[in-house]
């Protein structure tokens, strides 16, 4: 269906639904009457087949303790093979309530207090807090931005940081939040080779893997150089981003190496005492096996791409010195306003003049990004038009 039809069928006004993005603005902002473009979830209902699967299960079954549904396992394996050319084995799969919890468990299982953990900056701020909450040190290795506003890695700088700080763990974001970069196999091969050379364990957060809106195809970290690095790696994902179900607390944790898997599960057993969420498994099985869900995802990507192209066209015409990073993956636009706005004026501009609630740049790596915002484009074109015109009008 076209984007107008998709909006009419699936867009929903979420105010009053206890949405963190819409109803939780007081948690992050100075006012509560803002158009929210911050939290990374969608303003769209999930596909009907998923809604039906959940409702049918609840109507027919009590919500008691369950064991893992083998249909769920088969659905995950099939999805990875069909969508991402990644051949998983059943015993590689374990789970966590969400990707960030899985990362925190990995930090607990594979590092010690005061160890150093590397990330490529700018990056999702929860990586930093996951490390600092566990008394580990984040080593943020800044990426370089070229004239096309694409970010690249200086591999020499990355390796020097690994050595100087005796880094034990690298958290990789693939695709990369907030910059929208979809990593190529060559790029990841260079990063992972450095990690292996210096005995650095790798976590690959692949939660945005299905949200590819540009020309670069998604490559799972698990398949880089035909799986050459899987013995030193854990990959994680979830349908929460792809099908807008973050409230269903479930993420796949994929661990090919048996020793690492045992170590992870042993740590997990100390902090978590159940391993099956029947509603999440029901939703995942429907999402990964029903043609309607896959068609819905295709329509979402078209919607997001149209929103991104509109935003870029209007902002770049009105504000020619603005810098917008190419959004090849995710539904998140990363925009630098430094040519027009001072760092100290960003919050006032967006909150009090534009009446918008973006994710502010410093949330992704500190004051170096204070003139940036990340805008969530998984909403109606009408909302994106309103936000775009407000920005142009107030700068």
What spans do the regions from the language model cover?
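Conserved core of the PLP fold type I
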Residues: 63-193, 210-227, 234
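PLP-dependent enzyme catalytic core of the Aspartate aminotransferase-like
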Residues: 349-358, 364-395
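A structural alpha-helix within SAM-dependent methyltransferase catalytic domains
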Residues: 159-162, 192, 196, 351, ...
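N-terminal small-domain helix-loop-helix segment of the aminotransferase-like
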Residues: 2-98, 105
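Conserved core segment of the aminotransferase class I/II
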Residues: 52-56, 226-305, 313, 395
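Walker B catalytic acidic pair
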Residues: 206
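Conserved glycine-rich beta-strand-loop-beta hairpin in the small C-terminal domain of fold type I
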Residues: 285, 301-312, 324-337
